[in-house]
Amino acid sequence: MFRLHLFYGFFVALLLSSCAPKHYQLTGIERTRIIIDSRYDQNPDEAAVRFMAPYKRVNDSIMAPVFGRVAHNMHPQRPESDLSNLLPDILIWAAKDYNESPVFAVYNMGGIRSDLYKGDVTYEHILSVAPFENKICFITLTGELVMKLFEQIARRGGEGVSKGVELVISKSDAGYRLVSARLHGQEIDPTAEYRVVTLDYLQEGNDGMTALSEGKDVVKPQDPNNCSRFLIMNYFQDKHARGEIVDAQVEGRIKIQ
């Protein structure tokens, strides 16, 4: 009888040990790059094409309309680029619809998610550039906070700023540092107040620009039509109606010495 109990005890212990959770340990990582391009269009799965056709028609009807044209390829990069100049300028342009007259605009590089390419600009292109729900936002900063903001922009190696902003940044092993800042050719008055237009995401102090969260008289329109992509779309539509092609250039708004 003792041997029988011993056998059953051993069997139960073996069963429990086999059911215990296994602990895995990573021993290595391998990766490869799979390029998704037109090669996959050469032999499409006909059943999949038929299944997707009605959804594709709806998607194309939304994404394909042309809202304007750009004069050349535009790519976002620090410290300054044509595209990162265009977008804050669009915020300045849009401000009139809110009865606002901002002195300058800030648009974060991280919020620019794609390039624009020479020629027609569709809703798909605009959505690719500005896919987030970031909305236009207005705030008043003292000159002291403006300088703090420009110092934060300098430490990041540059962000999108509107025409009239002139920043000089130095670069060393310790990083980037603001050397000088001017607005529309004038020195920043630390006691003056400056109206700024930006995105609500930045006004909350994100992307290292905490100075924007320290201002006052904040106006944050919450209607979905105030999202940056719709403002960009409206800008292109306006230019297109006037027969104008959208253009932007690097102008020396942010210089690194």
Describe every region a protein language model picked out.
Residues 1-7:
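Bacterial N-terminal signal peptides that target proteins for export
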Residues 9-12:
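Sec-dependent N-terminal signal peptides
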Residues 15-18:
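C-terminal motif of bacterial Sec signal peptides marking the signal peptidase cleavage site
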Residues 21-37, 86, 92-94, 100-105, ...:
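Feature captures C-terminal
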Residues 31-115:
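Hard-cation-handling environments
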